[in-house]
């Protein structure tokens, strides 16, 4: 029995179970839809997740687990968060394809502001209220700017990690020149201020053409519990914390923009 109440009986036995029985992974996909991301990028981001769950690499990653099944929910966020797809059991190609199709049919949303702390709190609640239990619990958060609303990101990060939940990040860095809502070292911000927990990592997208490959590599790593390897794959960078890094840069930028 692990820390989350998940025993390790056979895969066959678990496939006969229903309800709140255990899964290898509870995965919250938390996707930034703030107005600082262009509509084209939003569509590329959505398409990247849809295509990923149709790929055989995802099923192979799921198959590496002891139980061969995971639970996934899809959230979109800005200043607030919205659960777009409910907790869904994925254990075979059919269930993965159904999840992908359900996501494809959802409208693209836009939400003002960028509150990493709010979405982390929202995702924590989803994990605890889920009908499923995972031997691993991961929040996969993507975004294109630092936290500028709610409590500071490190506070939310620490609250999440102390509950045994890992936070991984995808830093979206498509701008040639930063604007009032972005910073040039967003990947460093995510490593220092957002992600955390055992094996936590950050990946970055600096060109729109990288979305699909980065999303697939990130999901494969999270589902299998392994780091991404291979020269052709985007490489994750582990979390690292330095007291000298300014984790309040987003809040300071927001204050300057409104003239405080």
PLM regions and their residue ranges:
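Acidic, polar low-complexity linker/tail segments
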Residues: 4-28, 34-41, 133, 161
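Von Willebrand factor A/integrin I-like adhesion domains
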Residues: 172-229
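Short beta-strand-loop
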Residues: 65-102, 179-192
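Sec-exported extracytoplasmic/periplasmic mature domains
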Residues: 47-58, 108, 124-132, 147, ...
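Second-shell loop/turn segments in exported
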Residues: 30-40, 72, 86-88, 102-113, ...
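VWA/integrin I-like adhesion module and closely mimicked acidic/polar interface patches used
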Residues: 146-192
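Von Willebrand factor
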Residues: 21-86, 98-142, 169-185, 214
């Amino acid at each position: 029995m692990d820390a989350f109440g998940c025993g390790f009986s056979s895969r066959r036995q678990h496939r006969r179970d229903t309800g709140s029985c255990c899964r290898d992974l509870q995965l919250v996909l938390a996707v930034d839809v703030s107005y600082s991301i262009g509509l084209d990028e939003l569509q590329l981001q959505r398409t990247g997740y849809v295509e990923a769950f149709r790929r055989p690499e995802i099923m192979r990653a799921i198959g590496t687990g002891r139980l061969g099944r995971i639970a996934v929910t899809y959230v979109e966020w800005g200043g607030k968060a919205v659960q777009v797809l409910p907790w869904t059991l994925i254990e075979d190609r059919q269930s993965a394809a159904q999840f992908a199709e359900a996501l494809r049919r959802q409208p693209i949303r836009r939400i003002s502001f960028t509150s990493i702390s709010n979405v982390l709190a929202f995702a924590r609640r989803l994990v605890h209220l889920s009908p499923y239990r995972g031997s691993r619990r991961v929040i996969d958060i993507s975004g294109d700017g630092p936290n500028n609303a709610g409590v500071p990101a490190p506070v939310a990060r620490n609250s999440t990690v102390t509950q045994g939940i890992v936070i991984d990040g995808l830093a979206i860095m498509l701008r040639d020149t930063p604007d009032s809502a972005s910073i040039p070292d967003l990947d460093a911000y995510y490593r220092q201020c957002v992600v955390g927990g055992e094996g936590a990592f950050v990946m970055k997208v600096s060109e729109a053409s990288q979305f699909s490959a980065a999303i697939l590599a990130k999901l494969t790593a999270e589902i299998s519990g392994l780091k991404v390897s291979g020269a052709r794959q985007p490489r994750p960078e582990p979390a690292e914390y330095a007291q000298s890094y300014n984790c309040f840069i987003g809040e300071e930028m927001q204050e300057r923009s409104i003239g405080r």
